[in-house]
Amino acid sequence: MKEEMLEVVNNNDVVIGLESRKTIHEKGLLHREIHIWFMTPNREIIFQHRAKDKDTYPDLLDATVGGHVEPGMSYEDTAIKEGEEETGVKINLSKLKLTKKLFKKSFDQVTGRTNNTIRSQYVYLFEGNAGDLRVEEGKAIGFEVWKIDSLRTLGEEDKKRFIAFIFSDEFLDLFEEGQKLLGLK
């Protein structure tokens, strides 16, 4: 299998090189990613349950869609591509809203890898049934729907099922902003 290559960027989001995904995560090199958080008209978020053998954050709940920006692609093009690959949904651009670009550096204690990214965070108004989403084989186990308002008050046992950064004020505020951008609040 051919090794996935990704662009390494500087703090100004300018490409400075090309490295393998493995090397990028082993060395904590800055690279580009996207997240899409599917939100429903009922003010819920649909989380993706990551596969147990993922190289970072295995078996945890994460953004509905996430992916690396491939060489030569834009963040938006990646969101469209990954959205369809990971959920089976053809992304309607009028329902996709950029909330912000974040610099995120996190260390996964389970795998010993560092994810150092500039990540475009999108919200997407999903008006379908979560049960109709297609799971990308090998990448995810399934999807779970959670009320956005419940995230601030989850108990510690429930929180262990998610990637920890989801409960930071930065992300809880992002979810609030996302609801406003989508006209849900």
Task: Report residues per predicted region.
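Acidic, metal-coordinating catalytic segment for phosphate/diphosphate chemistry
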Residues: 1-35, 39-41
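A residue-level structural signature of the nucleotidyltransferase/glycosyltransferase Rossmann-like core
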Residues: 6, 44-45, 143
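Detector for glycine-centered tight turns/loop "hinges" at secondary-structure junctions
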Residues: 13-14, 43, 88, 112
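Nudix hydrolase/Nudix homology domain
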Residues: 22, 71, 100-105, 109, ...
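Conserved Nudix-box catalytic region and its N-terminal flanking loop in Nudix hydrolases
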Residues: 23-34, 44-81, 85
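Short strand-connecting beta-turns/loops that link adjacent beta-strands
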Residues: 41-42, 138
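A short coil-to-beta-strand element that immediately follows conserved catalytic motifs
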Residues: 90-100
